[in-house]
Amino acid sequence: MKIKIALCQINVVDNKEKNIENATSMILKAVKQNADFIVLPEMFNCPYSNEKFIEYCEEETHSPTLSKIAKLANENNTYILAGSIPEKEGSKIFNTSYLFDKNGEIIAKHQKMHLFDIDVKGKIYFKESDTLSSG
């Protein structure tokens, strides 16, 4: 049995609706190439910054991003791994990946456990843990 996997690279911008449109376009392009399993990148709907994680976070049950991906999986009869989005759960925000089946149902979910923190004195400082919680 062969499975065709499509890995989508997306230029994320500071506009959630545009990012969802870009993801949709990439998914439909992969579908046209007969992909069985489509993979979106980490934080595909949100610029990669702590401030934006807060601004762009969505609750799983009220998520325009996840609703769109579910619809696309169902309409195109394909599995989609929604790389990750900033997911709000209670007072916490997680970097969460979702796997959708061909019916558009969430069949798996993973909250990132090992957050990316870097502090190189005088060069670079970025700590996901300043905003995100470990799953």
Question: What positions do the PLM features span?
Answer:
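Short, conserved active-site loops that position catalytic residues or coordinate cofactors/metal ions
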Residues: K2, L7-Q9, Q33-Y56
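Active-site beta-loop-alpha substructure in enzyme catalytic cores
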Residues: K29-L40, F126-G135
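Feature marks short, surface-exposed loop/turn motifs that line or immediately flank catalytic pockets
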Residues: N11-D14, F44-P47, H114-F116
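Active-site catalytic loop in hydrolytic enzyme cores
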Residues: K88-G135
